[in-house]
Protein backbone atom coordinates (compact mmCIF):
# COMPACT_ATOMS: atom_id res chain seq x y z
CA UNK A 1 0.00 0.00 0.00
CA UNK A 2 2.83 2.39 0.90
CA UNK A 3 4.54 1.76 -2.46
CA UNK A 4 1.29 2.50 -4.29
CA UNK A 5 0.88 5.79 -2.44
CA UNK A 6 4.45 6.76 -3.30
CA UNK A 7 3.84 5.86 -6.93
CA UNK A 8 0.67 7.97 -7.02
CA UNK A 9 2.46 10.89 -5.42
CA UNK A 10 5.32 10.60 -7.89
CA UNK A 11 2.93 10.51 -10.84
CA UNK A 12 1.05 13.54 -9.54
CA UNK A 13 4.31 15.45 -9.21
CA UNK A 14 5.33 14.49 -12.75
CA UNK A 15 1.94 15.56 -14.10
CA UNK A 16 2.18 18.92 -12.30
CA UNK A 17 5.69 19.51 -13.65
CA UNK A 18 4.61 18.56 -17.17
CA UNK A 19 1.58 20.85 -17.00
CA UNK A 20 3.79 23.73 -15.87
CA UNK A 21 6.21 23.05 -18.71
CA UNK A 22 3.31 22.87 -21.17
CA UNK A 23 1.96 26.22 -19.95
CA UNK A 24 5.36 27.77 -20.49
CA UNK A 25 5.63 26.31 -23.99
CA UNK A 26 2.17 27.62 -24.86
CA UNK A 27 3.18 31.10 -23.74
CA UNK A 28 6.39 30.91 -25.82
CA UNK A 29 4.36 29.75 -28.83
CA UNK A 30 1.91 32.64 -28.43
CA UNK A 31 4.77 35.16 -28.38
CA UNK A 32 6.42 33.53 -31.41
CA UNK A 33 3.15 33.56 -33.35
CA UNK A 34 2.58 37.20 -32.50
CA UNK A 35 6.10 38.07 -33.64
CA UNK A 36 5.53 36.21 -36.90
CA UNK A 37 2.30 38.13 -37.45
CA UNK A 38 4.14 41.41 -36.99
CA UNK A 39 6.86 40.47 -39.49
CA UNK A 40 4.26 39.36 -42.03
CA UNK A 41 3.16 42.96 -42.49
CA UNK A 42 3.29 43.75 -46.21
CA UNK A 43 5.18 46.89 -47.29
CA UNK A 44 4.02 47.39 -50.91
CA UNK A 45 0.70 47.13 -52.64
CA UNK A 46 -0.19 47.19 -56.34
CA UNK A 47 -3.36 49.07 -57.11
CA UNK A 48 -5.50 48.94 -60.24
CA UNK A 49 -6.81 52.28 -61.46
CA UNK A 50 -10.52 52.69 -60.84
CA UNK A 51 -11.27 55.68 -63.05
CA UNK A 52 -13.46 53.64 -65.43
CA UNK A 53 -11.42 54.73 -68.46
CA UNK A 54 -8.49 52.33 -68.41
CA UNK A 55 -7.51 48.94 -67.10
CA UNK A 56 -3.84 49.72 -66.67
CA UNK A 57 -2.14 48.64 -63.44
CA UNK A 58 -0.25 51.36 -61.63
CA UNK A 59 2.03 51.40 -58.56
CA UNK A 60 0.53 53.71 -55.94
CA UNK A 61 1.96 53.99 -52.44
CA UNK A 62 -1.48 53.70 -50.82
CA UNK A 63 -4.75 51.95 -51.50
CA UNK A 64 -7.50 54.01 -53.07
CA UNK A 65 -9.53 53.62 -49.88
CA UNK A 66 -6.57 54.82 -47.83
CA UNK A 67 -6.33 58.04 -49.81
CA UNK A 68 -9.99 58.69 -49.00
CA UNK A 69 -9.64 57.66 -45.37
CA UNK A 70 -6.47 59.60 -44.54
CA UNK A 71 -6.79 62.49 -46.98
CA UNK A 72 -7.74 65.09 -44.37
CA UNK A 73 -4.58 64.49 -42.39
CA UNK A 74 -2.35 63.99 -45.44
CA UNK A 75 -2.99 67.56 -46.57
CA UNK A 76 -1.60 68.86 -43.28
CA UNK A 77 1.87 70.19 -44.18
CA UNK A 78 3.54 68.59 -41.15
CA UNK A 79 2.37 65.15 -42.32
CA UNK A 80 1.87 64.87 -46.07
CA UNK A 81 2.15 61.69 -48.12
CA UNK A 82 5.58 60.82 -46.76
CA UNK A 83 4.33 61.12 -43.22
CA UNK A 84 1.39 58.84 -44.00
CA UNK A 85 3.75 56.26 -45.48
CA UNK A 86 5.85 56.42 -42.31
CA UNK A 87 2.74 55.86 -40.22
CA UNK A 88 1.74 52.85 -42.30
CA UNK A 89 5.21 51.36 -41.91
CA UNK A 90 5.37 52.10 -38.17
CA UNK A 91 5.05 49.46 -35.48
CA UNK A 92 3.73 50.88 -32.21
CA UNK A 93 3.49 49.03 -28.89
CA UNK A 94 1.03 50.21 -26.24
CA UNK A 95 1.50 48.78 -22.75
CA UNK A 96 -1.81 49.09 -20.92
CA UNK A 97 -5.26 49.06 -22.52
CA UNK A 98 -6.96 51.22 -19.91
CA UNK A 99 -7.74 54.90 -19.52
CA UNK A 100 -4.57 56.04 -21.29
CA UNK A 101 -4.12 53.17 -23.72
CA UNK A 102 -7.66 53.26 -25.10
CA UNK A 103 -7.63 56.83 -26.49
CA UNK A 104 -4.01 56.47 -27.58
CA UNK A 105 -4.79 53.28 -29.51
CA UNK A 106 -7.98 54.79 -30.91
CA UNK A 107 -6.21 57.74 -32.51
CA UNK A 108 -3.17 55.80 -33.65
CA UNK A 109 -5.36 53.20 -35.34
CA UNK A 110 -7.45 55.95 -36.87
CA UNK A 111 -4.30 57.66 -38.17
CA UNK A 112 -3.29 54.50 -40.02
CA UNK A 113 -0.40 53.08 -38.01
CA UNK A 114 0.70 49.86 -39.70
CA UNK A 115 1.04 47.60 -36.67
CA UNK A 116 -0.40 48.17 -33.22
CA UNK A 117 0.54 45.87 -30.34
CA UNK A 118 -1.46 45.93 -27.08
CA UNK A 119 -0.14 44.50 -23.81
CA UNK A 120 -2.53 44.00 -20.87
CA UNK A 121 -3.44 41.04 -18.70
CA UNK A 122 -6.55 42.58 -17.14
CA UNK A 123 -10.18 41.98 -18.04
CA UNK A 124 -12.87 44.62 -18.56
CA UNK A 125 -14.83 45.69 -15.47
CA UNK A 126 -17.88 47.90 -15.14
CA UNK A 127 -15.79 50.48 -13.29
CA UNK A 128 -13.61 50.88 -16.41
CA UNK A 129 -16.37 51.95 -18.77
CA UNK A 130 -16.65 55.64 -17.86
CA UNK A 131 -13.14 56.38 -19.14
CA UNK A 132 -11.74 53.40 -21.10
CA UNK A 133 -13.47 54.28 -24.32
CA UNK A 134 -12.66 51.17 -26.38
CA UNK A 135 -14.53 48.85 -24.01
CA UNK A 136 -18.28 48.32 -24.08
CA UNK A 137 -20.74 46.86 -21.61
CA UNK A 138 -21.04 43.63 -23.58
CA UNK A 139 -17.29 43.03 -23.18
CA UNK A 140 -17.22 43.03 -19.38
CA UNK A 141 -15.19 40.00 -18.32
CA UNK A 142 -13.19 39.69 -21.54
CA UNK A 143 -9.51 40.53 -21.91
CA UNK A 144 -9.00 44.25 -22.41
CA UNK A 145 -6.72 43.69 -25.41
CA UNK A 146 -9.38 41.60 -27.15
CA UNK A 147 -12.11 44.13 -26.35
CA UNK A 148 -9.93 46.97 -27.62
CA UNK A 149 -8.92 45.22 -30.83
CA UNK A 150 -12.55 44.33 -31.59
CA UNK A 151 -13.40 48.03 -31.49
CA UNK A 152 -10.29 49.11 -33.40
CA UNK A 153 -10.91 46.65 -36.23
CA UNK A 154 -14.36 48.12 -36.72
CA UNK A 155 -12.82 51.58 -36.79
CA UNK A 156 -9.98 50.74 -39.18
CA UNK A 157 -9.40 47.26 -40.65
CA UNK A 158 -6.10 48.18 -42.32
CA UNK A 159 -3.62 48.01 -39.40
CA UNK A 160 -2.29 44.75 -38.02
CA UNK A 161 -3.39 44.34 -34.39
CA UNK A 162 -1.32 42.13 -32.09
CA UNK A 163 -2.70 41.17 -28.64
CA UNK A 164 -0.52 40.23 -25.66
CA UNK A 165 -2.90 38.86 -23.03
CA UNK A 166 -0.57 39.06 -20.04
CA UNK A 167 1.08 41.56 -17.76
CA UNK A 168 4.54 42.65 -18.81
CA UNK A 169 7.43 40.82 -17.14
CA UNK A 170 11.20 41.53 -17.24
CA UNK A 171 11.82 38.18 -18.89
CA UNK A 172 9.38 38.71 -21.76
CA UNK A 173 9.61 42.48 -22.27
CA UNK A 174 12.75 42.45 -24.49
CA UNK A 175 11.27 39.80 -26.79
CA UNK A 176 8.12 41.87 -27.26
CA UNK A 177 9.74 45.31 -27.57
CA UNK A 178 12.25 44.31 -30.24
CA UNK A 179 9.54 44.04 -32.91
CA UNK A 180 8.34 47.64 -32.47
CA UNK A 181 9.62 51.10 -33.36
CA UNK A 182 8.13 53.12 -30.50
CA UNK A 183 6.54 52.30 -27.13
CA UNK A 184 3.73 54.02 -25.21
CA UNK A 185 3.65 53.57 -21.44
CA UNK A 186 -0.04 53.62 -20.51
CA UNK A 187 0.30 51.82 -17.17
CA UNK A 188 -0.43 53.01 -13.66
CA UNK A 189 2.18 51.50 -11.34
CA UNK A 190 5.82 52.48 -10.74
CA UNK A 191 7.38 49.01 -11.09
CA UNK A 192 6.02 48.56 -14.62
CA UNK A 193 7.00 52.11 -15.57
CA UNK A 194 10.63 51.47 -14.68
CA UNK A 195 10.56 48.14 -16.53
CA UNK A 196 9.12 49.72 -19.68
CA UNK A 197 11.64 52.56 -19.65
CA UNK A 198 14.62 50.28 -19.01
CA UNK A 199 13.64 47.93 -21.81
CA UNK A 200 13.02 50.80 -24.23
CA UNK A 201 16.46 52.29 -23.52
CA UNK A 202 18.29 48.97 -23.82
CA UNK A 203 16.63 48.26 -27.18
CA UNK A 204 16.84 51.82 -28.52
CA UNK A 205 13.10 52.57 -28.62
CA UNK A 206 11.60 56.04 -28.05
CA UNK A 207 9.10 56.05 -25.19
CA UNK A 208 6.00 58.20 -24.70
CA UNK A 209 5.04 58.06 -21.03
CA UNK A 210 1.93 59.54 -19.41
CA UNK A 211 0.02 59.38 -16.16
CA UNK A 212 -3.28 60.72 -14.84
CA UNK A 213 -4.99 60.93 -11.45
CA UNK A 214 -8.06 62.82 -10.32
CA UNK A 215 -7.94 66.03 -12.40
CA UNK A 216 -4.26 66.14 -13.33
CA UNK A 217 -1.92 64.46 -15.78
CA UNK A 218 1.72 64.38 -16.89
CA UNK A 219 3.40 63.55 -20.19
CA UNK A 220 7.03 62.94 -21.22
CA UNK A 221 8.77 61.75 -24.37
CA UNK A 222 11.74 59.73 -23.10
CA UNK A 223 14.82 58.20 -24.70
CA UNK A 224 14.38 60.54 -27.66
CA UNK A 225 16.53 60.64 -29.62
CA UNK A 226 17.23 56.98 -28.80
CA UNK A 227 21.01 56.92 -28.52
CA UNK A 228 23.07 53.93 -27.32
CA UNK A 229 23.69 53.41 -23.62
CA UNK A 230 26.46 55.77 -22.51
CA UNK A 231 25.81 58.34 -25.25
CA UNK A 232 25.10 61.65 -23.47
CA UNK A 233 23.32 63.10 -26.52
CA UNK A 234 20.42 60.69 -26.11
CA UNK A 235 17.18 61.65 -24.42
CA UNK A 236 16.77 60.99 -20.68
CA UNK A 237 14.98 57.91 -19.45
CA UNK A 238 12.45 57.46 -16.66
CA UNK A 239 15.24 56.74 -14.16
CA UNK A 240 16.97 59.99 -15.14
CA UNK A 241 13.83 61.93 -14.21
CA UNK A 242 12.94 59.79 -11.17
CA UNK A 243 16.12 58.09 -9.87
CA UNK A 244 14.24 56.87 -6.79
CA UNK A 245 10.69 55.50 -6.84
CA UNK A 246 8.03 57.13 -4.67
CA UNK A 247 7.37 55.56 -1.26
CA UNK A 248 5.13 52.55 -1.82
CA UNK A 249 2.47 53.79 0.59
CA UNK A 250 2.27 57.14 -1.19
CA UNK A 251 1.21 55.66 -4.54
CA UNK A 252 -2.50 56.32 -5.12
CA UNK A 253 -4.41 54.41 -7.77
CA UNK A 254 -7.42 55.59 -9.76
CA UNK A 255 -9.54 53.20 -7.70
CA UNK A 256 -8.57 55.01 -4.49
CA UNK A 257 -7.91 58.56 -5.68
CA UNK A 258 -10.46 58.78 -8.47
CA UNK A 259 -10.11 59.93 -12.07
CA UNK A 260 -12.13 62.06 -14.47
CA UNK A 261 -12.55 60.41 -17.86
CA UNK A 262 -11.75 63.51 -19.94
CA UNK A 263 -8.53 64.03 -17.96
CA UNK A 264 -7.05 60.61 -18.67
CA UNK A 265 -8.51 60.81 -22.18
CA UNK A 266 -6.66 64.08 -22.79
CA UNK A 267 -3.36 62.51 -21.74
CA UNK A 268 -3.94 59.43 -23.91
CA UNK A 269 -4.73 61.56 -26.95
CA UNK A 270 -1.57 63.60 -26.32
CA UNK A 271 0.41 60.36 -26.20
CA UNK A 272 -0.93 59.45 -29.63
CA UNK A 273 -0.02 62.91 -30.91
CA UNK A 274 3.54 62.67 -29.61
CA UNK A 275 3.91 59.21 -31.11
CA UNK A 276 2.77 60.51 -34.50
CA UNK A 277 5.27 63.37 -34.25
CA UNK A 278 8.11 60.98 -33.43
CA UNK A 279 7.16 58.61 -36.26
CA UNK A 280 6.73 61.25 -38.96
CA UNK A 281 9.42 63.76 -38.00
CA UNK A 282 12.83 63.81 -39.66
CA UNK A 283 15.96 63.08 -37.63
CA UNK A 284 15.64 65.00 -34.38
CA UNK A 285 18.10 67.66 -33.31
CA UNK A 286 18.52 67.30 -29.51
CA UNK A 287 19.37 70.98 -29.05
CA UNK A 288 16.26 72.05 -30.99
CA UNK A 289 13.95 69.65 -29.12
CA UNK A 290 14.95 69.66 -25.44
CA UNK A 291 13.17 67.06 -23.28
CA UNK A 292 10.30 68.41 -21.22
CA UNK A 293 7.57 67.42 -18.80
CA UNK A 294 4.06 68.53 -19.75
CA UNK A 295 1.72 69.04 -16.79
CA UNK A 296 -2.05 69.19 -17.28
CA UNK A 297 -4.42 70.44 -14.59
CA UNK A 298 -8.09 70.50 -15.51
CA UNK A 299 -9.10 73.06 -12.87
CA UNK A 300 -6.18 75.45 -13.24
CA UNK A 301 -5.50 78.40 -15.49
CA UNK A 302 -3.65 77.86 -17.71
CA UNK A 303 -4.48 74.21 -18.23
CA UNK A 304 -0.97 73.28 -19.35
CA UNK A 305 2.51 73.97 -18.00
CA UNK A 306 5.86 72.76 -19.30
CA UNK A 307 8.99 72.03 -17.28
CA UNK A 308 12.27 71.49 -19.07
CA UNK A 309 14.04 68.26 -18.15
CA UNK A 310 17.75 67.73 -17.73
CA UNK A 311 19.77 65.53 -20.06
CA UNK A 312 20.75 61.97 -19.24
CA UNK A 313 22.15 61.53 -15.75
CA UNK A 314 25.84 60.70 -15.61
CA UNK A 315 25.18 57.97 -13.03
CA UNK A 316 21.91 56.58 -14.41
CA UNK A 317 21.52 52.88 -13.72
CA UNK A 318 20.36 52.11 -17.26
CA UNK A 319 21.46 54.73 -19.82
CA UNK A 320 24.87 55.86 -18.49
CA UNK A 321 28.26 54.40 -19.31
CA UNK A 322 28.26 52.72 -15.88
CA UNK A 323 24.81 51.16 -16.25
CA UNK A 324 24.01 48.26 -13.94
CA UNK A 325 20.72 47.33 -15.62
CA UNK A 326 21.22 45.30 -18.80
CA UNK A 327 19.21 42.96 -20.98
CA UNK A 328 20.92 40.10 -19.18
CA UNK A 329 19.80 41.32 -15.75
CA UNK A 330 16.25 41.60 -17.08
CA UNK A 331 16.20 38.10 -18.49
CA UNK A 332 17.78 36.40 -15.48
CA UNK A 333 15.58 38.25 -13.01
CA UNK A 334 18.38 39.93 -11.05
CA UNK A 335 16.75 43.32 -11.68
CA UNK A 336 13.84 43.09 -9.24
CA UNK A 337 11.39 45.91 -9.93
CA UNK A 338 8.97 45.00 -7.16
CA UNK A 339 11.81 45.08 -4.62
CA UNK A 340 13.16 48.33 -6.10
CA UNK A 341 9.80 50.09 -5.84
CA UNK A 342 8.79 48.46 -2.57
CA UNK A 343 5.52 46.84 -1.65
CA UNK A 344 2.82 48.96 -0.08
CA UNK A 345 1.92 47.54 3.28
CA UNK A 346 -0.27 48.55 6.15
CA UNK A 347 1.34 50.98 8.53
CA UNK A 348 -0.52 49.32 11.36
CA UNK A 349 -2.00 45.82 11.36
CA UNK A 350 -4.49 45.16 14.12
CA UNK A 351 -4.84 42.05 16.22
CA UNK A 352 -7.96 39.87 15.83
CA UNK A 353 -9.29 41.31 19.11
CA UNK A 354 -9.22 44.79 17.60
CA UNK A 355 -11.28 43.83 14.57
CA UNK A 356 -14.91 42.88 14.10
CA UNK A 357 -16.80 41.62 11.06
CA UNK A 358 -19.90 43.45 9.82
CA UNK A 359 -22.04 40.47 10.82
CA UNK A 360 -20.65 40.40 14.36
CA UNK A 361 -21.13 44.16 14.64
CA UNK A 362 -24.82 43.82 13.75
CA UNK A 363 -25.21 41.04 16.31
CA UNK A 364 -23.66 43.15 19.05
CA UNK A 365 -25.48 46.32 18.06
CA UNK A 366 -28.74 45.41 16.30
CA UNK A 367 -30.03 48.97 16.72
CA UNK A 368 -27.90 52.06 16.49
CA UNK A 369 -30.66 54.23 18.00
CA UNK A 370 -33.20 52.87 20.52
CA UNK A 371 -36.84 52.97 19.50
CA UNK A 372 -37.79 55.07 22.53
CA UNK A 373 -35.20 57.69 21.61
CA UNK A 374 -33.27 57.19 24.85
CA UNK A 375 -29.56 56.54 25.08
CA UNK A 376 -28.58 52.98 25.86
CA UNK A 377 -25.42 51.96 27.66
CA UNK A 378 -22.41 51.22 25.47
CA UNK A 379 -23.90 52.87 22.41
CA UNK A 380 -21.38 52.49 19.58
CA UNK A 381 -19.78 55.37 17.73
CA UNK A 382 -18.97 54.69 14.08
CA UNK A 383 -16.18 56.79 12.58
CA UNK A 384 -16.01 56.71 8.79
CA UNK A 385 -12.47 57.69 7.72
CA UNK A 386 -13.14 57.97 3.99
CA UNK A 387 -12.67 61.40 2.45
CA UNK A 388 -15.77 63.62 2.55
CA UNK A 389 -16.50 63.23 -1.17
CA UNK A 390 -16.86 59.47 -0.66
CA UNK A 391 -18.79 59.87 2.59
CA UNK A 392 -21.30 62.05 0.72
CA UNK A 393 -21.91 59.23 -1.79
CA UNK A 394 -23.08 56.79 0.88
CA UNK A 395 -22.64 56.37 4.63
CA UNK A 396 -23.81 54.22 7.51
CA UNK A 397 -26.63 55.63 9.60
CA UNK A 398 -25.43 57.81 12.50
CA UNK A 399 -21.79 57.48 11.48
CA UNK A 400 -19.52 60.51 11.69
CA UNK A 401 -16.94 61.46 9.09
CA UNK A 402 -13.33 62.12 10.11
CA UNK A 403 -11.16 61.67 6.98
CA UNK A 404 -7.99 59.64 7.34
CA UNK A 405 -6.03 62.59 5.94
CA UNK A 406 -7.22 64.70 8.86
CA UNK A 407 -6.31 62.02 11.38
CA UNK A 408 -2.82 61.54 9.95
CA UNK A 409 -2.13 65.26 9.73
CA UNK A 410 -2.44 65.72 13.49
CA UNK A 411 0.41 65.07 15.87
CA UNK A 412 0.10 61.92 17.95
CA UNK A 413 0.12 62.04 21.74
CA UNK A 414 1.73 59.25 23.78
CA UNK A 415 -0.64 56.45 24.69
CA UNK A 416 -2.39 57.36 27.89
CA UNK A 417 -2.56 54.43 30.27
CA UNK A 418 -4.10 56.43 33.10
CA UNK A 419 -7.86 56.20 32.78
CA UNK A 420 -8.35 59.31 34.94
CA UNK A 421 -5.90 61.51 33.02
CA UNK A 422 -7.04 64.08 30.51
CA UNK A 423 -5.22 63.49 27.21
CA UNK A 424 -4.60 66.37 24.85
CA UNK A 425 -6.92 65.67 21.96
CA UNK A 426 -7.07 67.35 18.54
CA UNK A 427 -9.76 69.84 17.59
CA UNK A 428 -11.43 67.55 15.04
CA UNK A 429 -12.62 65.04 17.63
CA UNK A 430 -16.31 65.48 18.56
CA UNK A 431 -16.89 66.59 22.13
CA UNK A 432 -18.66 63.38 23.11
CA UNK A 433 -15.66 61.32 22.03
CA UNK A 434 -13.19 63.60 23.78
CA UNK A 435 -15.13 63.36 27.05
CA UNK A 436 -13.19 61.52 29.72
CA UNK A 437 -16.43 60.02 31.05
CA UNK A 438 -17.28 58.17 27.84
CA UNK A 439 -16.34 54.51 27.53
CA UNK A 440 -18.75 53.67 24.72
CA UNK A 441 -17.08 51.59 21.99
CA UNK A 442 -15.65 53.20 18.87
CA UNK A 443 -15.75 51.37 15.54
CA UNK A 444 -13.77 52.70 12.60
CA UNK A 445 -14.79 51.92 9.03
CA UNK A 446 -13.33 52.75 5.62
CA UNK A 447 -13.80 51.56 2.07
CA UNK A 448 -11.75 48.35 2.08
CA UNK A 449 -10.57 47.88 5.66
CA UNK A 450 -7.05 49.27 5.34
CA UNK A 451 -7.23 52.94 6.35
CA UNK A 452 -9.46 51.99 9.27
CA UNK A 453 -6.63 49.97 10.83
CA UNK A 454 -4.26 52.92 10.61
CA UNK A 455 -6.93 55.17 12.11
CA UNK A 456 -7.48 52.81 15.05
CA UNK A 457 -3.78 52.92 15.84
CA UNK A 458 -3.80 56.72 15.76
CA UNK A 459 -6.88 56.96 17.96
CA UNK A 460 -5.27 54.68 20.53
CA UNK A 461 -2.09 56.75 20.42
CA UNK A 462 -4.29 59.73 21.29
CA UNK A 463 -5.56 57.85 24.34
CA UNK A 464 -9.15 57.33 23.22
CA UNK A 465 -9.13 53.73 24.46
CA UNK A 466 -8.88 55.07 28.05
CA UNK A 467 -6.05 52.73 28.92
CA UNK A 468 -7.98 49.71 27.71
CA UNK A 469 -11.31 50.60 29.37
CA UNK A 470 -12.86 51.56 26.05
CA UNK A 471 -13.02 49.39 22.96
CA UNK A 472 -11.53 50.97 19.82
CA UNK A 473 -11.45 48.72 16.75
CA UNK A 474 -12.25 48.56 13.07
CA UNK A 475 -14.95 46.91 10.97
CA UNK A 476 -13.00 44.28 9.09
CA UNK A 477 -13.17 44.48 5.30
CA UNK A 478 -14.72 47.93 5.40
CA UNK A 479 -17.83 48.93 3.50
CA UNK A 480 -17.07 46.41 0.79
CA UNK A 481 -17.56 43.64 3.37
CA UNK A 482 -20.64 45.48 4.68
CA UNK A 483 -22.16 45.18 1.22
CA UNK A 484 -21.29 41.47 1.00
CA UNK A 485 -22.50 40.53 4.49
CA UNK A 486 -25.21 43.02 5.45
CA UNK A 487 -26.61 45.17 2.67
CA UNK A 488 -26.38 43.89 -0.94
CA UNK A 489 -27.89 47.18 -2.15
CA UNK A 490 -25.03 49.21 -0.71
CA UNK A 491 -23.56 51.34 -3.55
CA UNK A 492 -20.43 49.78 -5.03
CA UNK A 493 -18.23 52.43 -6.59
Swiss-Prot record:
Binds 1 zinc ion per subunit. The active site is at residues 254, 446. It is found in: Cytoplasm, Cytosol. ATP binds at residues 99, 120, 127-131, 144, 188-189. Its EC number is 2.7.7.80, 2.8.1.11. It is an enzyme of class 2 (transferase). Pathway: tRNA modification; 5-methoxycarbonylmethyl-2-thiouridine-tRNA biosynthesis; Cofactor biosynthesis; molybdopterin biosynthesis. One of its GO terms (molecular function) is URM1 activating enzyme activity. Pfam families: Rhodanese, ThiF. Its main location: cytoplasm. GO terms for cellular component: cytoplasm; cytosol. Keywords: ATP-binding, Cytoplasm, Metal-binding, Molybdenum cofactor biosynthesis, Multifunctional enzyme, Nucleotide-binding, Nucleotidyltransferase, Transferase, tRNA processing, Ubl conjugation pathway, Zinc. It catalyses: [molybdopterin-synthase sulfur-carrier protein]-C-terminal Gly-Gly + ATP + H(+) = [molybdopterin-synthase sulfur-carrier protein]-C-terminal Gly-Gly-AMP + diphosphate; [molybdopterin-synthase sulfur-carrier protein]-C-terminal Gly-Gly-AMP + S-sulfanyl-L-cysteinyl-[cysteine desulfurase] + AH2 = [molybdopterin-synthase sulfur-carrier protein]-C-terminal-Gly-aminoethanethioate + L-cysteinyl-[cysteine desulfurase] + A + AMP + 2 H(+). It comes from the Eukaryota. Zn(2+) binds at residues 237, 240, 316, 319. Residues 376-491 form the Rhodanese domain. PROSITE patterns: RHODANESE_3. CDD domains: ThiF_MoeB_HesA_family. Plays a central role in 2-thiolation of mcm(5)S(2)U at tRNA wobble positions of cytosolic tRNA(Lys), tRNA(Glu) and tRNA(Gln). Also essential during biosynthesis of the molybdenum cofactor. Acts by mediating the C-terminal thiocarboxylation of sulfur carriers urm1 and mocs2a. Its N-terminus first activates urm1 and mocs2a as acyl-adenylates (-COAMP), then the persulfide sulfur on the catalytic cysteine is transferred to urm1 and mocs2a to form thiocarboxylation (-COSH) of their C-terminus. HAMAP family: MOCS3_Uba4. In the N-terminal section; belongs to the HesA/MoeB/ThiF family. UBA4 subfamily. This is Adenylyltransferase and sulfurtransferase uba4. It comes from Aspergillus fumigatus (strain ATCC MYA-4609 / CBS 101355 / FGSC A1100 / Af293) (Neosartorya fumigata).
Amino acid sequence: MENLEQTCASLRAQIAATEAQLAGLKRELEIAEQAAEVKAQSTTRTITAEDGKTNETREWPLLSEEYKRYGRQMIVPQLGLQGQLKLRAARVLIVGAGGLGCPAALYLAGAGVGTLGLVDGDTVENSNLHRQVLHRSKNVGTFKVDSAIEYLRELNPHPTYVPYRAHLTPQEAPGIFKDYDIVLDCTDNPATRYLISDTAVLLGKPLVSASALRTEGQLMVLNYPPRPVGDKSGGPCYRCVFPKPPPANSVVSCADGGILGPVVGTMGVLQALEAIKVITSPAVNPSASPPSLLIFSAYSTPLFRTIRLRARRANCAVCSADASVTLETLKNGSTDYVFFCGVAGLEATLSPEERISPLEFKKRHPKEVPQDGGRINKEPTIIDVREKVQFDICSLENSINIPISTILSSASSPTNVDANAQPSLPFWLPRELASADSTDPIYVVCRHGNDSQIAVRRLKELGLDRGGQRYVGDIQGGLRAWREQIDPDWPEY
